[in-house]
Each structure stands twice: as C-alpha cells, then as structure tokens.
C-alpha cells in the first residue's frame, strides 16, 4: 500500500521487490500493526515524509535474504521485528552518548524510509529485533511501537509508586500491565464519561479510573500522557505531587494551553519522549513475556488498510489493527 500524497487514501500497487544492501536484511512480511503515527503521516500532521511512501513500522516477518556484513546473529528463516527507528549514523554526539534516538540523521521506518504495508521490506539488521517465541505473528506486532515507545515513556517515570496514565489506548494498555506487574498503584484517565474504558482499566487492576477532567483520590508521583491532546498536560500537572513528572509519550500533540507557573512549581517536570533506542527494545522484549503482556488485536487484509485507518480515526477498533500480509510458509 502506497501513500502518494498526505490526506489521500493509500493505493494498492505493485512495486519492485527490494534487494538487501550491506548490513541489511530482506524480510518477507507476515503482519504489520497500524499505529496512530501512521495516521499522523497519512494525514499530513508530520512534516516531510518520503513520498511516495510505504507506511508501517510495527513489522513482523521472516528473513529471506541476508546482505553483506550482516551480524551472524541473523540467518535466513529467522523471525524478526522491524521498528520505527530504522537507521542512525552512529557518529554524532547523540549516538556517541547512548542517545541514538535523538540522532539528527536518523531514518524512520514508514516515514523517511519505506515500511511494512508490503510483502517485502529491507531493514538495517542492527535495528531489527528477534521476537519472543511466546507470541504469534499477530500478537507480537503491536509490541513493536505501542510497546516500545510506551516502555520508553514508562522508564522515564523511574520508580514512581503512584502512576497516572492519560488515555487508555494501545500503548497505555500494554504499559499498564508492566506497571501492575511491578507493583505500581495505577490511576487511569479516559475521555470524560467513558465508563466502559474506565471499567476495563479497573478490571485490569487500576486502583482508580476516571475522566481526564477528574482529580485522582491521591496525588501522583508521575503521569504518562498517551493521548495526543495538549490540554491534558496542565491537567496532569495539577494532579502531580511535588517533584512529580509528566511524560508526553506521543510523536504529535495538539497545542498545550498556557497554565499558571504555580502548577509547575515545586520541581514538577514536563518532558517528551522521542523515538526509541535498541536498549529499550532489548529490555522490553525481555520483560514482555515475563509479565506476560497480552495484546488485543483486530485483523485486516493488507488491501483493507484504508478501512483500518478510517475505523482507527473514528475510534471504532476493538483492539490494535493488524494487517495480514503473508503467511510466508510459516504456521505461527
């Protein structure tokens, strides 16, 4: 599926099969989960995408060909995941200080390089992950962005005991499971009046769930905002205890309104999360099967990607949309 221009439907099109260059894997794709970032790209909310573009960055597939100088840890037939961060230069001040997620020359899968809404993709082997055997090809796909970016956001809350989560979509649902596994007190904020989602959060184990316009029964040590809604930032600040942190976990957010300095005072912090690092992935794919994190998915054939987009925009999905692309000769 190809995006020719933002704000236009994706087009089903035959494209040339890619060939792996030095350090790259050729991957036959079996599934690719749909992320809200894909919508931001398709809707023109993120600047300067590669065009025409094959979207998708939660890619699960099997290695079909290995390019020159690929590490011996990868072999033909291996199942791999291809995430958002697709390449960094390894030389800049950020890469040399273990902050490759901030590399000025970074390339991003399904944004500045072609992604996974296709039968094949090439990817830099350094940024591919071996995936836990516990999960099948559909279950594991949402972990490659909602899980990874969510986990990086979660790490920024350190050892905060009282954790608030604003928005209870894909990433929040995954990270809530880790927080509960690690013994955090979880407070979940949804759209005002969304009793169904609040009940779902409480059934999962949240100590409290309410609307984003409510104050929690206790002050929070940290809050993660997964919804791309700027006014949630001052709302979360007001719910924080002294010294607390608000982590903005999305790549895009509507404008943040002004707020009194008193809401920020007493060493409260607002921070964003950008992209991910390979270390994030290694840690996350180690802990995910131990929790074990469970994913909720709804599948679509590749050619119905536009339908998946429309249902995502309308809030009509029952779980993470996952595109089914090829069985690749594998039963999983």
Label the predicted regions.
Residues 16-32, 45-93, 127, 132-135:
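Glycine-rich beta-strand-centered segment in the early N-terminal region that forms part
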Residues 187, 195-269, 330-332:
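Glycine-rich cofactor phosphate-binding loops and adjacent beta1-alpha1 units
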